Amino acid sequence: MLVSGPVAQEKQGIWLISVIGATLKKIRDDAYDASLSPDGSQIVFRDSITRDIWLMNADGGQARSFLKPEESYNLYSPTWFPNGKRILYAKYHENNGEVSLGLESRDLKGGDMVPLLSNPRLTDLCWGQSGQLIYSVRERPPNQYDSNLWEIRFDEGTGKPRGNPRRLTDWTGFIFVDPGLTADGNRFVFLNVRPQSDVYVAALTNGGSELKAPQRVTLDERTDWPGGWSLDSKTMFLYSDRNGNFDIYKQGLNERNAEPVATGSDEKWAPQITPDGKWVLYMQWSKAIDGPAVNSGKIMRSPLAGGPSEAVMDIKGHPETLFGDPTYSVGGFPSFRCRLHAPSGCVLAEKGDKQIVFTAFDPLQGRKAELAKISVDPDSANWDLSPDGTRVVVSIFDYKAADIQIASLAGGTPQKLSVMPWTELGAVAWAADGKSLFLASISSRGTSIVRMPLTGGPKLLFKQPSWDIFSLMPSPDGRYLAFGPVITTANAWTIASFPRK
């Protein structure tokens, strides 16, 4: 049996498992997305460092690069054509929120890449009994949490499609993951996977060095993300798609229901209170069928006392998503932070060429001077602004990266801190006193929330095997930590005959 990914305490790799003796043998480090050829002689996989697609013999020998991605593109899920003569893979690109996702193939002997289909809502695939490709596609909003099955036929020799895709199902309540057919082709099997993000709050005690059991704040069954806090730390601001698109809400810590702050047809993300406590700021983009219609938006302000929202300034780009999945759309750039004691009031972070650009802005007057630039891959970076507004911290989401950078917005060389063994840092946040940091370390074994003093070593505060945490929001008074875990449920399904629409 061939498996790839992390196993137990090991990191990414390719493994052979003996079904008889239950022994485990690693044949390749720093590799995943492995697929065995139909004749069992070769393995195609992704290198987790270079992101190239590689080939090797079934025993791990004679490894060689097969395909390198173009600049700013990523290649995913390589698999074999049924005849074993071509490699099929997903090609992904995201630029300022515009997602390009398609399937291509290449002959095992090399040559040009041949496109098969393109759809930004493509999610998973398998081969049919007669050699056709069966794949799942997410529905358009407001049904983006459902997917359905399609099929397409092609020439196995050239990889070129034959005819147009054909829809197979018209179901609701399903997201197809790992679809496939049994060996005899008589049963269709798949996982129905339902990810959902909610807002949780946990009390910090003992000077922030201990975390009490978290309590769920949002009780609906939609996607909810935490934003900022009120200045008195009694109210959370959040954004939720409970009405079909993301709107802004506020909810007291002791309340069961959220109150709308800003609603409407546009997408609205990441609310935060202004330093004077009079306005709620948030980012806004026009809504489109398959993601943002434009790659620019606005920072808006809504009066806390009530009334219409007003534009503060234009912003470029759109926070990235994971294959267009709104459940995982909390990170990315642009993003902003406001702090009570910040010299500039608020700071905007935007994606540059292999760097993050920080710019000051005023909630009433708009964009001001550029403050600093940090050289880092923005596609895998997270950041936060210190409570006094003079420093930023940047972390990297990578399974080998356990370093964070702290940089002064006044200039100078960034300070590097190691939080080893905690890697894959999905979120980072300053503690209210500015003397420590909170980090979310994500792995296949769940998420760990870690406290990192600026002058000491990391300490584990909380661990949850079934959660992926992509946001951390400490309250201004230092008594609470809000976060947004993605909790995924998965059930295996089997159908006696292949689905038809």
Feature annotation, model-predicted:
Residues 1-6, 26-47, 53, 70-93, ...:
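Conserved beta-propeller blade repeats
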Residues 3-12, 19, 94-101, 108, ...:
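Beta-propeller folds
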Residues 9-15, 50-54, 96-104, 142-151, ...:
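Structural motif
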Residues 18-22, 57-61, 107-111, 154-158, ...:
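Short loop/turn segments that connect beta-strands within beta-propeller blades
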Residues 20, 30-32, 49, 59, ...:
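A generic "binding-loop/recognition-motif" signal
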Residues 22-25, 61-65, 111-115, 163-166, ...:
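Predominantly a core beta-strand signature of beta-propeller blades
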Residues 114-115, 159-161, 178, 198, ...:
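Extended hydrophobic-aromatic, low-complexity segments
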Residues 153-155, 162-166, 446-489:
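C-terminal closing repeat unit and adjoining cap/tail of repeat-based domains
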